[in-house]
C-alpha cells in the first residue's frame, strides 16, 4: 500500500502543475475562449462608459459603469490586438481593473477594448474603445474652486488646470429642475487656466458638471464628471413678503415684523441641500423719511433681523441678490405714527422768539425737531438738529428760535414731531419723544372768531352764533371759546366758556329794553385769544297776547254796535223823510161795482150837488188782497185842484189784472 501511495502522490502533483500551467493567470490577458457564450443579447442595460488609461509608467487601468441589477453579474474586459488576436481579463463583480505592460496587451500600438458582462444567462456588451494605452493618460476633471461669473449674457466658468495635464478637451453638461442633462463643448484648452462659456438662464437655477480628456487623442477616455457646479438664475427671485408694524410703545419705538418668509428657489437634483453658488441673499434696507437733516438716512440689515423703529415714516425695501448681483427690489411704505400728545409740549411765545419745552429722555441726547404745514406733502418737512443736551433742573429739554428765522412764522397749523437718539449715526436707534400740533404766527389774532350774529331765542334769551376759528383746524390747539356779554346800563359783564367743537351758545336771563354787547374769543392751552368786534343788541318789550286779544275784541264790538245803531237811525229817518207812495193796483179805491160802466166828468159843474158841497176827495188804500180794506193814510185834495178826467174803462177783468200784478 505504501509503495502505491508513493507513486500516486507525485503523479497527482505533476498533473496539477500541468493543469495550472495550462490555465490563464489573473494578472495576464487570457488568449482563450471566454467561459460564456460570446453573443450580445442586445439588452438596454449593461456596461457603459468604458475608460482605459495609463496611471503610471508601467501600470494601466480600465473602469466602467454598469446599469442594471448587479447581483450575480460577472464582468470581462475584452481586448483585441492589431494582429487580430483577442484576449480577456476576468474582473468578477468589480467595475475597475488594473494591469501592467507585461499582461500581454500591447501598450505602444493601437488596441480595441470593450466590456462583456454575463448576467442572467445572457451576455451584455459595452461600446468599443480604440486607443493607444501608453499615450492615453488619465485626465482629472476640474478640481478645486470653479469660479463662476457673467460675461456678455453668458455664464463663464474658470478653474486651475490639474498638474501635468496642460492641453485638454473639455465638455460640460447642464440641467434645470425640470429638464434632463444637455451636453455642451467648451473647446480645446492649452493653458494653466482653463475656462468655459455656458448658457445662462434668466429665471431658473442650473446644475453644471465638467469633464476633461487629453487634447488630440480622439480615442482617449474622458475623465469622470466633476462635482456639481450650481448656478443661480441671472435675475434673483423677487421676494414676496409682508410686513406689519406694532403700536408705538412707551419708549417711542415700534417693532417691525415679517409676516411671510421669501419663497425658496427651486434647485436641480444635484444642488439640493447645501449647494454653494445658488444662495439668494435677502437684505432689508431702511430709509427714514422723517427728520431729513440727520446725518444718515439709510441702513441695510439682514432680513432675519427685524429692527425696532421710531414713529417716523419709513420706506422699507427688500433687496434680493446672488453671485451675479442684486435683483429687483420690492418696497413698502410705513407711514408715520400720528398719535399726538397735546399736553406734552409747552410753547412760550415772546418778543425775542419762541421756545419749546418737553420732557427730556436722558443725558447727552440729540433731538431732531421736525415741523411741516398740515395738509402738505411730507417731503416739504423742515427740521432742526440740536446738539447733545442734558435735561435742565426741571427735567425738560428746550429748543428756541427767533422770529427772524421764519420758523413756523406763517399763520397756519403745523404738525410737530420730536425724535431723540443717543447715537444719531445709527438709524435704528432713533425714538419718538412726542408728536403734536402747533398754530404758527400770531395765533391770538388769527384765531379770533368772525361773523358773530345774535338772534332772539325767547323773551329773556338770545342765541349767539359765530364762524369757527382758524385754530379749530389745528387738532388739540383750540382749548375753548369764551363768550362775553356786557350790560350797557349796569356795566355788568358775564363770560361763558364754550366747547371747542361748538359755535353757538344761548344767553339767558336778559332783560327787555336793555342794550347789550356780545364778543367771542378763542383760547389755546397757553395763550388767550383776541375778542371779536362787539355786537350790540337788545330785546324789545313784549305786550301780553291776552291784552292784545281783548283790545282787539273791544274794538270789534264797538264798531259792530256803532254800525247797528247807525243802521237803525237811518232807517227811522228814512220813514219820516221819504214816506212810501201808494200802489194803484193794491188800492180798493179804484174798484167800481156794477160791471163795465163808463164815468166821465170834466167839470164840477156837471155835478151841481157835488160842486156845491166842495168836499174833499178821500182815497182809502188797502194792503190786503181780500175785499176788506183798512185805511192807512188819507189824502185830501185841496180846493182849486184841477179837474180829474177819468177816461178809463175799468172792468172786473181789469181789476183782477191789477190784483194779479200785486
UniProtKB/Swiss-Prot annotation:
Organism expressing this protein natively: Homo sapiens (Human)
Q: What subunit structure does UniProt give?
A: Dimer or oligomer; disulfide-linked. Interacts with IL12RB2 to form the high affinity IL12 receptor. Heterodimer with IL23R; in presence of IL23. The heterodimer forms the IL23 receptor.
What this protein is reported to do is described as: Functions as an interleukin receptor which binds interleukin-12 with low affinity and is involved in IL12 transduction. Associated with IL12RB2 it forms a functional, high affinity receptor for IL12. Also associates with IL23R to form the interleukin-23 receptor which functions in IL23 signal transduction probably through activation of the Jak-Stat signaling cascade.
- Protein localization: Membrane
Please tell me which stretches of this chain the record labels as motif Box 1 motif: 577-585
The keyword Acyltransferase appears for this protein: no
Keywords for the protein's UniProt record, in alphabetical order: Disease variant, Disulfide bond, Glycoprotein, Membrane, Receptor, Repeat, Signal, Transmembrane, Transmembrane helix
Stretches with biased composition (Basic and acidic residues)? 626-637
The disease tied to this protein in UniProt is: Immunodeficiency 30: A form of Mendelian susceptibility to mycobacterial disease, a rare condition caused by impairment of interferon-gamma mediated immunity. It is characterized by predisposition to illness caused by moderately virulent mycobacterial species, such as Bacillus Calmette-Guerin (BCG) vaccine, environmental non-tuberculous mycobacteria, and by the more virulent Mycobacterium tuberculosis.
Q: What is this protein called?
A: Interleukin-12 receptor subunit beta-1
